[in-house]
Amino acid sequence: MKTLFERYKKLNINGSLICLEQVEDIYSYFCYPTNAKAIGFEGSIMYCFIEPYGDMVFACNPDTCADVFVYPLAKTFEDFMGLILACGSTNPIEQIVWMNKEQFAKHLQGEEAVRTEEQRAVLNHLEKKLGISPLDNPYDYVKELQSHFDNSGIEYSDEYYD
């Protein structure tokens, strides 16, 4: 049985429409964990799995507004897709780490206002083909996950510590 991530990859969608672009030539930033497996990118932000955490999805942001470069976004890839369906793209989800609830709500409104028909079509396609629904209360879900996260399984290159 294929994992949801494998099913997602087989859809061959234009990931840039949900800020989850597939990149062939990956530039490795200092904060990208050495034990990470890339899912997709939004500019320099890498979304990934990290080996000891199974299906948990992380953001790795070299230009973070928070006090950490790597942080969890979803317990599973299925939840990650549900968050994308709820928020329209990875962008609002990734920014929860430094936002309060009011900032997040305002950001979501702004994202919704500029969402294109092509983006809406991709979101509808994902929902139907993967058989998942938007996740309720994305802000609370992500904040709860981040508040109890043990990052001791994340491995960095020597460059990170320099």
PLM regions and their residue ranges:
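A surface-exposed partner-binding patch
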Residues: 1-65, 91-92, 98, 116-162
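Compact, glycine/acidic-enriched structural inserts
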Residues: 59-100
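Hydrophobic alpha-helical interaction segments
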Residues: 99-107, 115
